[in-house]
């Protein structure tokens, strides 16, 4: 009996930890080849001036964030099912988006840059429908354990933790800024880049997925993917 009690307590503690586990997710749209080429071109430019930045690769997938939320890890399958219903009812591949400018989010002397698309009505409706669908499975916040981290960079920037916590409503609806992140560079360089004329172009989503977020808000680990072809 003396042996069983600690074992039961250990089992109970592990179960509670599993229940409390949280994942920081990004429900996103994967852009077509037109956007991919432009994003990769810009990423190469940024890496030349800031080699310590990141390349667009398997752990930094080019994408358009629709929503970012903290969800209970135990409910991930329910999140996928809820998102699938919304995506199946929307003609996502038929959405035509216009990329019209560069932008960046400043962080001290550097900035996280991207290509911005206009937030058209179809995209805003998709976002709102996804927010409603996954709300039953969300929690208010998380910590570094909710994200993909590396041994060299184990602590997530507190500003990112806060950003995901307040994505709804601070980055949704009228505040939605659909974009494809392209990399990191010194703010001085990015200011010059933004001052130059931007050649607008149109593109469409080619797919949708759920990713676990990493540092800089990157799509670091694919959790679920959908084929949206009609």
Question: What role is predicted for each listed range?
Answer:
Residues 115-119:
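A short, structured beta-strand-centered segment in the mid-to-C-terminal lobe
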Residues 110:
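Conserved active-site/ligand-binding neighborhood in enzyme cores
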Residues 17-107, 120-209, 213-230:
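Basic, often amphipathic N-terminal segments
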Residues 2, 15-18:
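N-terminal targeting/docking segments
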Residues 1-3, 86:
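A generic membrane alpha-helix/interface feature
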Residues 3-12:
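Sec-dependent N-terminal signal peptides
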